[in-house]
Every structure is written in structure tokens, then in C-alpha cells.
Amino acid sequence: MNKKLFLAAALICAALTSVSLLPRANADAADEIKRLAALMDWKPGTIVADIGAGDGRYAFAAAQLVGSSGKVFATEIDREKLANLRSQVTKRHLTNVVVLDSKEADTNLPAECCDAIFLRRVYHHLTKPVQFDQALVRSLKSGGQLAIIEFPPRSGLEPVEGVPANRGGHGIPQKIVIEELTSAGLQLTKTLNDWPADDYCVLFLKK
């Protein structure tokens, strides 16, 4: 087999593998969102934000749970991901999902718009956490909840460029998440260390 044929075969195999794994990934996301919804007491009509929504699988799963009377803000900072999110929202006819262009130091969410906000493996990427935390607090209604799903620093992974040095590598210690968000004015309500993929989940409340 010549080099071009080998490369083509490898690309086809990779694409087929990616497609075959997609249903499992979507199912895992749906299961994780159901657990998060139970913890945060989402109901039909709840307004939720997924910060750093990526490919949208968690935001779209959330949209099913809050129903047509609810709303999900899906925010992203990456242009390609934003375009894909908007395309998927249109393709799926998701009238209760709003895609927003987030910023490095701001969620771009309306003030006091959300009953619940979650960041899944996003917080350790924040380069301006103090300003971003203030934006998160502004975006929550009184009595609203914030969930941070993260993992501790892991060996073998390069630190994210531009983040504070106290992260200790790629990831973030749970202690720092708690310190930063309580300093922003939120109340710690629960920590869970049995989240999928060896992640942890920390819940906060805006009084």
C-alpha cells in the first residue's frame, strides 16, 4: 500500500471510529446532565447557561430537560464552535437554546438571567478568573446556583497558556475553585468527588 492510500485508509478509520463513538458520548452527556439537573433542581421553565458549550451536547441535553418553557444559553469563545452551535440549533429546531459569544473576562449573559449556570471542564481555562467570576455572579438570579465540574492538575498535560500560576498544571485544585468563587460572593453548598471520569463537582449558591 502506498503512502497516499495508507493515509486515506487511516483517515476513513478515524472518521468511522468518531461516528461510532458519538452515540455513546451523547448518552454519557445526557446521563451527566440528568444528575446535574437533579442536584440543581431544574424544572420545566428553568433558565440554564452552559459556559463553554463546545459541541453543544450538554447544552442540548439540558434543553430537553427544561422544556419549551425554559431556556438554555450556550456560550462559546471559539469562532468555529460558535458557528457549529448555531448551525446545530437551527438544524435541530431548538427554539429554547440561545447561542452567545462569550469573552475572556465576561460571560456576555444578561444580568440576573439564570436560575443555574454550569461550567464543565472550562474553569481551568479561564485566564481572567476574577473578572469572569464577577460576571458569573451578575448573571445569576438571587437564589441561583453555579456548578463547576473540573479535574485536579494531571501529570503529562501542558498547563493552559495564560492562566494563573496557582493552577499547578493542566486542571485546577478543588480548593482554589472554592476559594475564588466564595471570594466572588457565592456560598459553597456541596462538593462531590465521585463525578464521571475522575472529575469533581462543586455547587455554589447566590444568596
Language model features: what each stretch is:
Residues 44-54, 82, 145-176:
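Conserved class I S-adenosyl-L-methionine
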Residues 113-130:
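A short SAM/SAH-binding and catalytic strip from SAM-dependent methyltransferases
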Residues 188-207:
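Core SAM-dependent methyltransferase catalytic element
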Residues 28-46:
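Conserved alpha-helix/loop element of class I SAM-dependent methyltransferases that forms part
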Residues 63-67, 130-145:
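A short glycine-rich, Lys/Arg-flanked "PGG" loop and its adjoining helix->strand segment in the class I
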Residues 43-46, 107-117:
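A short acidic, Gly/Pro-enriched loop at the edge of an enzyme's catalytic core
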